[in-house]
Amino acid sequence: MQLKNLDTGVALPLPDDLLWSDEHAWSPAVANASYLITGSLLIQSATRKSGRPITLVGAPDMAWVTRAAVEQLRAWAAIPVGGSTGRFELTFTDGRVFTVAFRHQEVAIEAEPVLGIPARSGNDFYRLTLRF
């Protein structure tokens, strides 16, 4: 799996064992129901064109990344979505590719040291959660 910054072309490899936790908790169909003044039910529905959430979660004993990778991800997550910035290409090992942006309305990145103590080196490992 890899995440590529579409503005700079820089790619960051991610562990293949990150789990897409909300992969099947989303539907492209969206609807709104309301009652008219006459008492009739009005249902408006459409198909979403974008905005599918992707949450990647690492299990406690796998999908670790280095502190250096966490720092790169945090720097990328700090980029606001603009004309050509803040968009990334997420490529899964099975070939699926998504254009994503970090979810700034939520905590975009959670990283916890594997050893439970503050990491000192760029090579120390972290458990990771990413929200796009």
Model-identified regions with their sequence ranges:
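Extracellular/virion structural assembly segments
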Residues: 1-132
